[in-house]
Amino acid sequence: IFEGEYLNGKRNGKGKEYYDNGNLKFEGEYKNGKRNGKGKEYDYFGNIRFEGEYLNGDRVLVHISFNNKIK
């Protein structure tokens, strides 16, 4: 499930993705339908598992978190 901004039918701007259980999966920025800019990924149970930056859908700056502790 996606909640956020669209431009010309593509995800663009700030948005959030959710798992089927309703928990947040990703929150961050999109450009031309792809993750682009700052974002956070969460596991199925709501724990942060990645925080960093994306470029054209790829991770380019990574801060990985295990058990909610940034490493």
Task: Identify the residue ranges that each predicted region occupies.
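Glycine/tyrosine- and acidic-biased, solvent-exposed loop/turn segments at the edges of beta-strands
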Residues: 1-71
